[in-house]
Structures are given as structure tokens and as C-alpha cells.
């Protein structure tokens, strides 16, 4: 039985057995026991018993002021409060820590030097 552990593009992030665990696209995010647990599209992020628990739009999903734990969207360029102000690129799924615009540009300059 094939096992895809993590693929952070438009498609599957993790499959265990026949069960989709994570999907970082525009639609379903997690299926457990035949139920959609989390939905990472432009509107709701997680539902429990018909209640919206988290919203995956331009807001951060987990942010403690310095660390971004999880964001199912684009590369983050600037955070103001708990809102993502600027972002670019299609792929980032999870990071630890946060780079400012200046730090990010410096990193890009180093990578392409």
C-alpha cells in the first residue's frame, strides 16, 4: 500500500493507508472516519459538529506573537497583529519562526548571489 507522507504543493500532503490525513490545496484538509474535520479554502478551516472552529482566509491559524506554527496558504512576508498583510508564492505550509521583509530579502540575495 503506497504511503505519501508529505507533499506541499497544490495536492496531497499525507496519506496513510487509504485515508487522506492532510491536503494543502483549496478544498479538503483532513478526513477522519469519513468526516471532513478541517477545510482549508477561502472560508472555514475547521468544523466540529456543524460549528466553525477556525477560519482560513487571510488570518493566521496559530500565532503567538513571534512564531507562526501553521498557515495553509502562501509565503508570508509581513504580519501585523494576527493578520497576514502581505504574502507571495503558492506553497508554504508550516514554519517555525518568522522572517521580516528585510530578513527575507537578505536571504533571497544570499541564495541567488
Residue map of PLM features:
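Long terminal segments
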Residues: 1-26, 33-34, 42-43, 49-113
Amino acid at each position: 500500500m503506497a504511503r505519501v507522507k508529505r507533499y506541499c504543493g497544490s495536492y496531497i500532503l499525507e496519506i496513510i493507508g487509504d485515508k487522506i490525513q492532510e491536503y494543502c490545496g483549496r478544498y479538503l484538509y483532513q478526513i477522519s472516519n469519513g468526516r471532513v474535520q478541517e477545510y482549508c479554502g477561502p472560508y472555514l478551516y475547521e468544523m466540529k459538529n456543524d460549528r466553525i472552529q477556525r477560519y482560513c482566509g487571510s488570518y493566521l491559524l496559530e500565532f503567538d506573537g513571534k512564531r507562526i506554527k501553521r498557515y495553509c496558504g502562501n509565503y508570508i512576508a509581513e504580519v501585523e497583529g494576527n493578520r497576514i498583510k502581505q504574502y507571495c508564492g503558492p506553497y508554504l505550509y508550516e514554519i517555525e519562526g518568522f522572517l521580516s521583509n528585510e530578513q527575507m530579502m537578505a536571504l533571497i540575495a544570499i541564495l541567488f548571489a
